[in-house]
Amino acid sequence: MENIIRKPYLDKIEQALGKDVIIVLVGQRRIGKSYLLRQLKDEKAKDSSNNIIFVDKEKKEFDDIRNYRDLNAFIDEHRVEGKKNYILVDEIQDIMEFERTVRSYREEPDTEIVITGS
């Protein structure tokens, strides 16, 4: 099966990056939010000056991230000083009090936040 690059949507996300905003992709289930987030992750990973922090709450490897404290610990463990840190969280609504994390890391320099939710 061939993957479809959703360039117009990626371009819109790119335009919003660097503008001190939190990018939120919302919509009904199964419309491609997760796929778009993975495309963004793959695109940003091509640049070695970027650090990607990716959480996919639909994957069992992230089951231990249940609340904002768990998410903070995961992010802190994976952040890299001196690089542009991209915090990408898929299905963020599954993390209790996630808003606290989002507000906190929004203030961090060299940090971009893109999240999805249904």
Model regions: which residues?
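Phosphate-binding site recognition
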Residues: 1-118
